[in-house]
Swiss-Prot record:
It comes from the Bacteria. GO terms for cellular component: cytoplasm; small ribosomal subunit. GO terms for biological process: translation. GO terms for molecular function: structural constituent of ribosome. Disulfide bonds: none annotated. Belongs to the bacterial ribosomal protein bS16 family. Keywords: Ribonucleoprotein, Ribosomal protein. The keyword Ribonucleoprotein applies. It comes from Helicobacter pylori (strain HPAG1). This is Small ribosomal subunit protein bS16.
Length: 76
């Protein structure tokens, strides 16, 4: 199953997340199909960018979003 979720990048104690499309059986930071945005929780205000066109495409072909990505996509 294809899912849209966050992968963590950045340093220790300095998280930065990439919004990616991946297979649900992959590890959190394993390979991904496409990167469609990013999320920086440490910046003020929190920096969120998600490509809505690609998000809608992946949802139309059956990808499921994680709870966190659903909340972030409403804010972006």
């Amino acid at each position: 199953m294809t899912v849209i979720r966050l992968t963590r990048i950045g340093r220790k104690k300095k998280p930065f997340y990439r919004v990616v499309v991946t297979d649900s059986r992959k590890r959190r930071d394993g390979g991904w199909i496409e990167s469609i945005g990013y999320y920086n929780p440490l910046s003020e205000p929190k920096d969120i960018k998600i490509d809505k066109e690609r998000l809608n495409y992946w949802k139309s072909v059956g990808a499921k979003m994680s709870e966190r990505v659903e909340k972030l996509s409403q804010k972006a």
